[in-house]
From Swiss-Prot:
Residues reported to bind ATP: 132, 168-170, 176-177, 206-213, 240, 303-304
PANTHER family hit by this protein: D-ALANINE--D-ALANINE LIGASE, D-ALANINE--D-ALANINE LIGASE A
Protein name (Swiss-Prot/TrEMBL): Vancomycin B-type resistance protein VanB
NCBIfam families named in the record: D_ala_D_alaTIGR, D_ala_D_lac, D_ala_D_lac_VanB, PRK01966.1-4
Cofactor: Mg(2+); Mn(2+)
Keywords, comma-separated and alphabetical: Antibiotic resistance, ATP-binding, Cell membrane, Cell shape, Cell wall biogenesis/degradation, Ligase, Magnesium, Manganese, Membrane, Metal-binding, Nucleotide-binding, Peptidoglycan synthesis
Phenotype upon changing residue 185 to G: In strain: SF300
Cofactor note: Binds 2 magnesium or manganese ions per subunit.
Amino acid sequence: MNKIKVAIIFGGCSEEHDVSVKSAIEIAANINTEKFDPHYIGITKNGVWKLCKKPCTEWEADSLPAIFSPDRKTHGLLVMKEREYETRRIDVAFPVLHGKCGEDGAIQGLFELSGIPYVGCDIQSSAACMDKSLAYILTKNAGIAVPEFQMIEKGDKPEARTLTYPVFVKPARSGSSFGVTKVNSTEELNAAIEAAGQYDGKILIEQAISGCEVGCAVMGNEDDLIVGEVDQIRLSHGIFRIHQENEPEKGSENAMIIVPADIPVEERNRVQETAKKVYRVLGCRGLARVDLFLQEDGGIVLNEVNTLPGFTSYSRYPRMAAAAGITLPALIDSLITLAIER
């Protein structure tokens, strides 16, 4: 049987570049090479595409210039060797890219043009989930609770007196808590807006939600969905930003991730059902991690949806899947299969 040629794309221009490299390293270590023939394409922080042997911290050292061709006849890569391009057919693409140009529909559009099946959400659902304000509007219209929020553009000044503190100020289109600030008073607001504006021109100001933060890994296309165990983030202080820490592999500096979540089974079931509803409302396919707040009165409020969650050794999505009995090799296999079947 011929192996399935899988292009695993990692790195990228976003602030989450280093996380993406770590995710690709884990996937490379766990993909079934008896079934799949992986081709690793790294994107530098400056946006240069290169074919490399394997993802690692020094992946650029031994690499060749390569690009995905939008030509459907090529159906794959153009690789520069000895001043000439050679073509490499690809059966399916697995973008392991986080943040802008990875989770926002941009690279998904390239795969659509090229006619190559790809792991994860399509253009529309990727864009909707990446923009937190759009995700809130769509899910609220479907009857899902969301935080009170307002949007401003970079350089605008909100009417501070209309806000009930604390609030969170965050880039509307970013991830891993980059540019996110908890604001407790009017005096802190302008600095928080400036910090968020470094990552996006569209800024979200949302009401802080009391309760615990929980998450749910969802996998599948359309109605046939599989969920992982619910996890729970227990903070000692500050906000959850493990991907910005120096040594996250040794554990978070301010958070404990509990899998399964330390909540009653009935509440875990409700969180899973809410996560599946959010997934369907936003048109997700393949996979997504749905983050929610569980309030003391039992209310469940949407936080955000990550359409290409991390696959690092400390990432939440694979840990939730593992707690439900899905190993990382099996998870990778299932995600590639879902992409081909879609």
